[in-house]
Amino acid sequence: MTVSSAPGKVYLFGEHAVVYGEPAVPCAIERRARVTVERRDDDRVRVNADDLSLDGFTVAWGGEGDDAPELDVPTNLLEAAMGYIDGAVAQARDAADAPDAGLDITVESDIPLGAGLGSSAAVVVAGIDAATRELGAAIADEALAERAFQVEHEVQDGQASPADTFCSTMGGAVRVQGEDRRRIDDVGSLPFVVGYDGGAGDTGELVAGVRDLRDRHVFAADTVEAIGDLVREGETLLRGEDTPLDELGGLMNFNHGLLSALGVSARSLDSMVWAARESGAYGAKLTGAGGGGCIVALDDSEGSKTALDYTPGCEEAFRAELDTDGVRRES
């Protein structure tokens, strides 16, 4: 039996713009997905996922004559949850040169699904790592991140960025711009507060919407480039000896405004952003694809957390420190 875990993430800056070659800075947070894998004697795959904010399910498939898993859950749940796990299994089998290996897989996560916190990336990273090691092969972090990205890229119909999977694999604050992917070293404390509206945006649709806007309007393309310029300034601040939280927060506020202009915010997200700002946060913005899900605030006091607890439409609020660990080989 082999266990791996990987962290979720928030975007400090740069979501959506990263799809077009601009830099982004995602940061790993101390909420994780854990995947336990045990090899079977046959070629079937059995997945138990009873802690994915989805009511839980168990599914088994594989073997001659089985074209798809059978389970008593809605089709969209099957597609959302199983697409990533199925891709992780395929990547692990390929990495270990074990195309017919059967696996028992248990998935646990304290990262809300579809909320902009990198839940799918964390599950895929931890899943590939645990399954590959259970099948007797080793995998380097860089190769793991690339394989995990290939899974997300396929499941999201080519709309995915490598930022989520790279951040989940490496941990800490990272910079991603095309093929240039690296950790930002010696980043100080980043006191994040996350607000969650209980919803989930459709990443593929939101990314496609920004693409359409960018293709039709010069000002939208300029907005994407402005996000890239903002990220570069933020990265410079992160690399300093004393991280100026007030300046970082100001850039987060600006970034949220640009994302709103691109049409990816939502009323619930804006309400949480303003609640955090008015309670004294250095800055706040949506994180991830948008359309619903989460916001992230930068606040070293209890103000934002308390304000979000009482904000209509905010189902959960929690503190989330920067997690300097990426994938963990737990057993």
Walk through the language-model features, giving the residues of each.
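Short alpha-helical patches at coil-to-helix transitions and adjacent helical residues
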Residues: 9, 82-85, 121-128, 167
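Short pre-catalytic strand/loop immediately N-terminal to key active-site residues, enriched for Gly-Thr
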Residues: 108-115, 282-284
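DPxDG-like acidic metal-binding loop motif
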Residues: 28-31, 115-141
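Glycine- and acidic-rich phosphate- and metal-coordinating loops
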Residues: 89-112
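Contiguous, small/hydrophobic- and glycine-enriched helical/loop subdomains that border
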Residues: 100-103, 133-154
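FAD-binding core of FAD-dependent oxidoreductases
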Residues: 17-21, 26-30, 118-122, 160-171, ...
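C-terminal nucleotide
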Residues: 3, 7, 34-79, 83, ...
